[in-house]
Structure formats: structure tokens, C-alpha cells
Amino acid sequence: MTYMHNLGDGGFEWDASNVTHIARHGLQTGDVEHALTNDPVTVHYAVTDSGEPRWVSVGPTSTGRLLMVVWTVRGARVRVVTAYPAARRLQAAYAKAKGGRDGASKTDPPVQD
């Protein structure tokens, strides 16, 4: 099952904490931003105990590396909670959603809000 959410045009919200956090996974902000704006597949949606919605998306960096990104929206901006290289299971889910093993998409699968 995939979920759709419009990222909007408010950009990304970064601070020292989440920049440091993704750096521990060998990532930079540009990697994560590209993964979320370059035809990602959103594979999970949940609401935290505090009521904040969270999405889990898988998308490619500019070099084709697939990332798993947990994110939310605060105001008009995307706030990345964490990001790291996608596990094989998520890579397979991404490829399947894109229409094949190589991720080449013919059409996106149906989405649910």
C-alpha cells in the first residue's frame, strides 16, 4: 500500500540536530531532499502519540542510491525525522511500486490518503 502527500513548496526545515543525525548514516541534506522530491514512494503513514503525522518514503538520491526517509510537515515545511540507506525489503517495495525490478516506472500504483 502506498500513500500520497503533497510536499508543498515550503521547502525543508533543517537544524543542527537533524543534520547531525542523518550525517551519522553517511548522508547530507541534499541527498535526503533529492530522495523526497525525485519520485519517491511513500510506504507508511502513522500519527504519533503527540498527534504529529509521520510518513515513511523511499526515494533515490541523485546518484540512484535508495534512501528510507521518515518525515513530517510543520507549517509549510518538510521536517526530516531520520533518513538512512533503504534496506533490501524497502528497495524491493520501491521497485515493485515503480513497475519492475529496476524501478523503471510505467505508472504509479493506486494511492490512499
Indicate residue ranges for each PLM-predicted region:
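Ribonuclease/tRNase effector modules and their secretory precursors
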Residues: M1-D113
